């Protein structure tokens, strides 16, 4: 049975969906004003893995990941670029999809844009106003009154006094409490008309937190199974989502909360000021996308993930071992036999709070067994279980020879194969010095030759 670490209760719990056999999951997505960075990559890959495992476990999943396409940063960036909000956000949504596709991330079932749900947000704000949980501040913003929601702070495990003392919160004019947060931002004269919507409280735009409450309830209902996101969103974003949704609807918002850990770079926090900020595109210029996905999945999703070139290179070499086993022992197919002992250990790992670190260890056990036994069935298990994680779907030669998935051999392979043939002729003629010279020449160019029962094959070092 699947168990999930629930951030709300701070313990691992048996997963029981609201509707038997069906799961509804919402994940906070990207604010699209720039290219996605490594933190975004982790969120995308982690919850893609969660979605894949839920479906592999037989659940009928509805997966929603939103897009924030209206925000202070977006307005500022569009002004800097001299382009419309829609032009800017469309461009970065397309870039986000390109990055996600490269990382093997399947599209969610729904990918709502905040600007498409403004009416639903206004309806939710109106409900909060009717219940006395929201008020119009002196600057004409509509704010949520946290002191009116008795459970505020329960999610982050802090009292209101502790939160006021220890957290940096957005301050709006004439708030009743420093922790009160904006539901509706009154229009500013220096902002473009495309970010202004008519409302009962005057022209303006939604605050960040109300977006997710409105989109999730519209697509998944007032209560659903799983809500995910990065650890940085626990407070204030998810605390505020709970206050909004439970305040408006009067009952539990989400049953299981999941948060992935932070990404660090060379053991330091990733930030532009430290000069260690990397976009997904920066990393993919140097490493195969499947290596990046594998690197993310080697760690448990709740653990900190420390990025470095050395760690990515280690991931590349490890993934090479798995693909080498598939190349050496051609699998009969990629169907998983879930009654086989390795598959049972894989399932146990994944059912233990999506423990991909242990699941990946099972893949290496299978690779070692395939290399020892030459069993096509074992190789099929390896390929099939890897596929559950979104790995090992390519032809081994494509990965081992350094080509991207679907990328054709651009002629380099022909030249290398020609040298392999010359080496074979030299060996046949017992000119071992020439054979060794060819091997050394290729190795100097980063090409490793491996003699197998099926002939000589090559891969990148």
Curated annotation (Swiss-Prot):
CDD domains per the record? Anticodon_Ia_Cys, CysRS_core
Task: Quote the protein name from its UniProt record.
Answer: Cysteine--tRNA ligase
Matching InterPro entries, A to Z?
Cys-tRNA-ligase (IPR015803), Cys-tRNA-synt_Ia_DALR (IPR015273), Cys-tRNA/MSH_ligase (IPR024909), CysS_C (IPR056411), Rossmann-like_a/b/a_fold (IPR014729), tRNA-synt_1_cat_dom (IPR032678), tRNAsynth_Ia_anticodon-bd (IPR009080)
Q: Which family does it belong to?
A: Belongs to the class-I aminoacyl-tRNA synthetase family.
Q: Which species is this UniProt entry from?
A: Aromatoleum aromaticum (strain DSM 19018 / LMG 30748 / EbN1)
Compartments reported by the entry: Cytoplasm
Cofactor names from the entry are:
Zn(2+)
UniProt GO MF annotations: ATP binding; cysteine-tRNA ligase activity; zinc ion binding
What are the record keywords, sorted? Aminoacyl-tRNA synthetase, ATP-binding, Cytoplasm, Ligase, Metal-binding, Nucleotide-binding, Protein biosynthesis, Zinc
CC cofactor note: Binds 1 zinc ion per subunit.
Q: List the disulfide bonds.
A: none
Question: Gene3D superfamilies, per this entry?
Answer: Cysteine-tRNA ligase, C-terminal anti-codon recognition domain, HUPs
Q: Which reaction does it catalyse?
A: tRNA(Cys) + L-cysteine + ATP = L-cysteinyl-tRNA(Cys) + AMP + diphosphate
Residues reported to bind ATP: 272
- Subcellular location, principal: cytoplasm
Report the EC code(s) recorded for this entry.
Answer: 6.1.1.16
> Which NCBIfam families does the entry link to?
cysS
One GO cellular component this record assigns the protein to is: cytosol
């Amino acid at each position: 049975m699947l168990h999930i670490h629930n951030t709300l209760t701070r313990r691992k719990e048996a997963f029981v969906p609201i509707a038997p056999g069906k799961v509804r999951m919402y994940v906070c997505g990207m604010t699209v004003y720039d290219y996605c960075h490594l933190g975004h990559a982790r969120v995308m890959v982690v919850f893609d893995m969660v979605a894949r495992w839920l479906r592999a476990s037989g659940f009928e999943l509805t997966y929603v990941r939103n897009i924030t396409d209206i925000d202070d940063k977006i307005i500022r960036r569009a002004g800097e670029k001299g382009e419309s909000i829609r032009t800017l956000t469309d461009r970065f949504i397309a870039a986000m999809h390109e990055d996600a596709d490269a990382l093997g991330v399947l599209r969610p079932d729904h990918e709502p844009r905040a600007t498409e749900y403004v009416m639903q947000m206004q309806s939710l704000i109106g409900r909060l106003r009717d219940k006395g949980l929201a008020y119009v501040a002196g600057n004409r913003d509509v704010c949520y009154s946290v002191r009116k929601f008795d459970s505020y702070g329960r999610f982050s495990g802090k009292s209101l006094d502790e939160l006021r003392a220890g957290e940096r919160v957005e301050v709006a004019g004439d708030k009743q409490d420093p922790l009160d947060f904006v539901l509706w931002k009154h229009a500013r004269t220096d902002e473009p008309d495309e970010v202004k919507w008519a409302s009962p409280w005057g022209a303006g735009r939604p605050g960040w937190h109300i977006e997710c409450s409105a989109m999730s309830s519209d697509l998944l209902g007032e209560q659903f199974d799983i809500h995910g996101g990065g650890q940085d969103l626990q407070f204030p974003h998810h605390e505020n989502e709970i206050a909004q949704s439970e305040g408006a609807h009067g009952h539990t918002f989400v049953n299981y909360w999941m948060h992935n850990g932070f990404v660090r770079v060379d053991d330091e926090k990733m930030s532009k000021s430290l000069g260690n900020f990397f976009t997904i595109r920066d990393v993919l210029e140097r490493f195969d996308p499947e290596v990046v996905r594998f690197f993310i999945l080697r760690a448990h999703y709740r653990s900190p993930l420390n990025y470095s070139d050395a760690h990515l290179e280690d991931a590349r070499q490890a993934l090479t071992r798995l693909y080498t086993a598939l190349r050496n022992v051609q699998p009969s197919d990629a169907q998983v036999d879930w009654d086989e002992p390795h598959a049972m250990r894989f399932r146990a790992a994944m059912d233990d709070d999506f423990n991909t670190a242990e699941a990946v260890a099972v893949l290496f056990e299978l690779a070692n067994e395939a290399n020892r036994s030459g069993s096509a069935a074992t190789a099929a298990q390896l390929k099939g279980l890897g596929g559950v994680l979104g790995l090992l779907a390519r032809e081994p030669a494509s990965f081992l020879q350094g080509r991207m998935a679907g990328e054709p051999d651009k002629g380099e392979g022909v030249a290398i194969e020609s040298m392999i043939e010359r080496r074979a002729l030299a060996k046949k003629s017992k000119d071992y010095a020439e054979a060794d010279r060819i091997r050394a020449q290729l190795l100097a160019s980063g090409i490793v030759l491996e003699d197998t029962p099926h002939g000589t094959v090559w891969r990148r070092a």
